[in-house]
Amino acid sequence: MLAKRLVPCLDVKDGKVVKGVQFRNHEIVGDIVPLAARYAEEGADELVFYDITASAHERVVDKSWVSRVAEQIDIPFCVAGGIKTISQARELLAFGADKISINSPALTDPSLISRLQDEFGRQCIVIGIDSFFDATSNSYKVKQFTGDEAATKDTQWFTQDWVEEVQKRGCGEIVLNVMNQDGVRGGYDIKQLSLVRAICDVPLIASGGAGTMAHFRDVFIEAKVDAALAASVFHKAIINIGELKAYLAAEDIAIRR
């Protein structure tokens, strides 16, 4: 059995790490490099950095802090933010990122997924999906440009359809960001993640809702995800990664130690 991964998420805005609730009202929580170093020291398996306003503001993630992170940590990390071309992706990988993630640009141009996969290989292409439960239609739908509340818009895609589409086009991993659960620390959306798991043949990373150690246990056991991403519980030191790993190991979950 492959070991499950714990992945702290660092949302970046204007050169600082920020955190919001349900993708709104972001507040500054710290500096990029010190937080990255702290999580690596605590035992994180990898890190994800999202430049949350890059796509909406028509720019690419700032490469200067990418190189500084690469110099400070010895665990894999993934970078996202406005990546639209092979050359932009190549530059970020050259600056030290191990994976690149695309979200809104893939929705605008789905062929980007295939082009990146052809150039760099499936293993370093991650697709982020911002999924929102629409109570009116009783369905899960994909939203775009979610890093800027004023720019956020609905798309034509139902979440499960988009999950299938990005796999056909060659993605290597999927991060399912459950917007309704984001930042509220009430637990992962086991129902939605289980539905996606049933049609997802690539590694699936759960994102949105972690509040207790038991939430991590539940999402690994019940939704059978490959990794769990979290932000506020780590930023606010509610949960220590090393202690979380010990807890999960005691619950008979295969975890990297």
UniProtKB/Swiss-Prot annotation:
InterPro entries membership: Aldolase_TIM (IPR013785), His_biosynth (IPR006062), HisF (IPR004651), IGPS_HisA/HisF (IPR050064), RibuloseP-bd_barrel (IPR011060)
Briefly state the protein's biological role: IGPS catalyzes the conversion of PRFAR and glutamine to IGP, AICAR and glutamate. The HisF subunit catalyzes the cyclization activity that produces IGP and AICAR from PRFAR using the ammonia provided by the HisH subunit.
Q: Which Pfam families match?
A: His_biosynth (PF00977)
| Reaction(s) the record says it catalyses | 5-[(5-phospho-1-deoxy-D-ribulos-1-ylimino)methylamino]-1-(5-phospho-beta-D-ribosyl)imidazole-4-carboxamide + L-glutamine = D-erythro-1-(imidazol-4-yl)glycerol 3-phosphate + 5-amino-1-(5-phospho-beta-D-ribosyl)imidazole-4-carboxamide + L-glutamate + H(+)
Catalytic residues in the record: D11, D130
Q: Where in the cell is it found?
A: Cytoplasm
Q: Does the keyword Cytoplasm apply?
A: yes
Q: What is the name of the protein in this document?
A: Imidazole glycerol phosphate synthase subunit HisF
EC number annotated for this UniProt entry? 4.3.2.10
Query: Which species is this record about?
Result: Shewanella baltica (strain OS155 / ATCC BAA-1091)
Q: How does it assemble?
A: Heterodimer of HisH and HisF.
Q: What class of enzyme is it?
A: lyase
Report a single Gene Ontology molecular function.
Answer: imidazoleglycerol-phosphate synthase activity
GO terms for cellular component: cytoplasm
Q: Which UniProt keywords apply?
A: Amino-acid biosynthesis, Cytoplasm, Histidine biosynthesis, Lyase
Pathway the protein takes part in: Amino-acid biosynthesis; L-histidine biosynthesis; L-histidine from 5-phospho-alpha-D-ribose 1-diphosphate: step 5/9
Q: What is its main location?
A: cytoplasm
Into which family does the record put it? Belongs to the HisA/HisF family.
One Gene Ontology biological process: L-histidine biosynthetic process
